[in-house]
């Protein structure tokens, strides 16, 4: 061993276990514009000081391990370590606190959501010194944002492609989600689109099953799109789910969709994975396809209030990885959602610059610079009587995605789609005339019923 690499016991190195807070708790640290900042909700084991547990989170999600190692002396820990720089109690929760951690940007590969999450949440959530841990928010610095392509096209480009302005877009998920033949599936798509919807959608678990192979579904849906476009004079689309068992197969399906000339494909970004999603997003940008994102499996990650990851973090990650639409909850439908919190991450999806606002769950000011925005998709358990609230809450830059609220119409799919479109246009017209949708919404819908099925 050369003199330059030889390490002797007792010379600059002392083996053994020491408290994390001695190295990783730095309340005097001033965060840098280039740091990735994280807010963790920590529930420690009894008797452990918050400073030690906050420092443990910073250590185990960056450079630390359970003991001092001699290779620590071969690098600069002060340059690369995560730092717990602030701790605050959670109101109403005696055993929880928020630990703020700063990570140097050099810890992360450029343009890789996969690497970012592997570092920040990949290991520390199984740490036995913690009873529970939840990542509430991330601040992504501009320097890191600029390494991502982001959404394939964004809100304005999508509107230009569709030639549709001044209102939310309307969609419908085809039901039953499983069991239809490709031909019957295409018929259902056609009926919805000719009735007035902008989009129809594959359900998240429609891939390529024995009862309906993907290529057959793509062909019959493309036929439905072109036929409904010819009848209505509007541009239509169907979210063709390209999610597959391999990235190669996924791209093959997207290529076929492009060859058919349809405007949009779909991906289940959590079950498919961020690497696959980013690859598909790049393909869609290069080939003029819009990309609809479904968040299947999100509740496994974000449902618990004290463990896992809040959806606002997944929403930020999706904007970085790439998608033109993403499901965001409804506030008024059958799934969980708090209005202010939901609107907080809706703003994080759509806006260029979002100020810190703890009442809306936004822990950090976020600057997206030139990264395109993502349309939030309100879906699950909604129907025409929710239209006034949805129009008021989500505004024009959104997709209102019905299912049973269209297909459950007693006269069939096309009349259900007509009812959706009439209700939406009535609400938009009333809003533009200055009427209060929150107060007069029911009356507006009743008036619209006079000229709608």
Curated annotation (Swiss-Prot):
Binding-site residues for substrate, renumbered to this chain: 123, 173, 177, 295, 327, 379
Modification comment: The disulfide bond which can form in the large chain dimeric partners within the hexadecamer appears to be associated with oxidative stress and protein turnover.
GO biological process terms held by the UniProt record: photorespiration; reductive pentose-phosphate cycle
Enzyme class: lyase
Domain of life: Eukaryota
PROSITE patterns according to UniProt: RUBISCO_LARGE
Residues bearing the modification N-acetylproline: 3
Sites marked Transition state stabilizer: 334
GO molecular function terms noted in the UniProt entry: magnesium ion binding; monooxygenase activity; ribulose-bisphosphate carboxylase activity
Pfam families according to UniProt: RuBisCO_large (PF00016), RuBisCO_large_N (PF02788)
In-chain residues carrying the UniProt-annotated modification N6-carboxylysine: 201
Cofactor(s), names only, from the UniProt record: Mg(2+)
Modified residues (N6,N6,N6-trimethyllysine): 14
Cofactor descriptive note: Binds 1 Mg(2+) ion per subunit.
Prosequence residues removed at maturation: 1-2
Cellular compartments annotated: Plastid, Chloroplast
Catalytic activity: 2 (2R)-3-phosphoglycerate + 2 H(+) = D-ribulose 1,5-bisphosphate + CO2 + H2O; D-ribulose 1,5-bisphosphate + O2 = 2-phosphoglycolate + (2R)-3-phosphoglycerate + 2 H(+)
GO cellular component: chloroplast
Family, as annotated: Belongs to the RuBisCO large chain family. Type I subfamily.
More details: The basic functional RuBisCO is composed of a large chain homodimer in a 'head-to-tail' conformation. In form I RuBisCO this homodimer is arranged in a barrel-like tetramer with the small subunits forming a tetrameric 'cap' on each end of the 'barrel'.
Function: RuBisCO catalyzes two reactions: the carboxylation of D-ribulose 1,5-bisphosphate, the primary event in carbon dioxide fixation, as well as the oxidative fragmentation of the pentose substrate in the photorespiration process. Both reactions occur simultaneously and in competition at the same active site.
Protein name: Ribulose bisphosphate carboxylase large chain
């Amino acid at each position: 061993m050369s003199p330059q690499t030889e390490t002797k016991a007792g010379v600059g190195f002392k083996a053994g276990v020491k408290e994390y807070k001695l190295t990783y708790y730095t309340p005097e640290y001033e965060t840098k514009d280039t740091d990735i900042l994280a807010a963790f909700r920590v529930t420690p084991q009894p008797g452990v000081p918050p400073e030690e547990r906050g420092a443990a989170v910073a250590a185990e999600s960056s450079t630390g391990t359970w003991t001092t190692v001699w290779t620590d002396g071969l690098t600069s820990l002060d340059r690369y370590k995560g730092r717990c720089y602030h701790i605050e109690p959670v109101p109403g929760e005696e055993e929880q606190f928020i630990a703020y951690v700063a990570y140097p940007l050099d810890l992360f590969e450029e343009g890789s959501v996969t690497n970012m999450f592997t570092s920040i949440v990949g290991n520390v959530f199984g740490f036995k010194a913690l009873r529970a841990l939840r990542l509430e928010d991330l601040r992504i610095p501009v320097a890191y944002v600029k390494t991502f392509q982001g959404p394939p096209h964004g809100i304005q480009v999508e509107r230009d492609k569709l030639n549709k302005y001044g209102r939310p877009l309307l969609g419908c998920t085809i039901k039953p989600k499983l069991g239809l033949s490709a031909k019957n599936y295409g018929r259902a798509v056609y009926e919805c689109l000719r009735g007035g919807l902008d989009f129809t959608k594959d359900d998240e678990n429609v891939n390529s099953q024995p009862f309906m192979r993907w290529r057959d579904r793509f062909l019959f849906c493309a036929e439905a799109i072109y036929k409904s476009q010819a009848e209505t004079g509007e541009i239509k689309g169907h979210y063709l789910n390209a999610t597959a068992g391999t990235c190669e197969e996924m791209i093959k399906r997207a290529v076929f969709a492009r060859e058919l000339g349809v405007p949009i494909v779909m991906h289940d970004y959590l079950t498919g994975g961020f690497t696959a999603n980013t690859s598909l997003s790049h393909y869609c940008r290069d080939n003029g396809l819009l990309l609809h994102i479904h968040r299947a499996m999100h509740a496994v990650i974000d449902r618990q209030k004290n463990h896992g990851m809040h959806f606002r973090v997944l929403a930020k990650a999706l904007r970085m990885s790439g998608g033109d639409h993403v499901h965001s909850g409804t506030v008024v439908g059958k799934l969980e959602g708090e209005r202010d919190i939901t609107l907080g991450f809706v703003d994080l999806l759509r806006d260029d610059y979002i100020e810190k606002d703890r009442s809306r769950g936004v822990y950090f000011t976020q600057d997206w610079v030139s990264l395109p925005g993502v349309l939030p998709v309100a879906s699950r358990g909604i129907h025409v009587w929710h239209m006034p609230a949805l129009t008021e809450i989500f505004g024009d830059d959104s997709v209102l995605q019905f299912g049973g609220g269209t297909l459950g119409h007693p006269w069939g799919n096309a009349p259900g789609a007509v009812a959706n479109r009439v209700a939406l246009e009535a609400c938009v017209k009333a809003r533009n005339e200055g009427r209060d949708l929150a107060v007069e919404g029911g009356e507006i819908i009743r008036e619209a019923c006079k000229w709608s099925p």
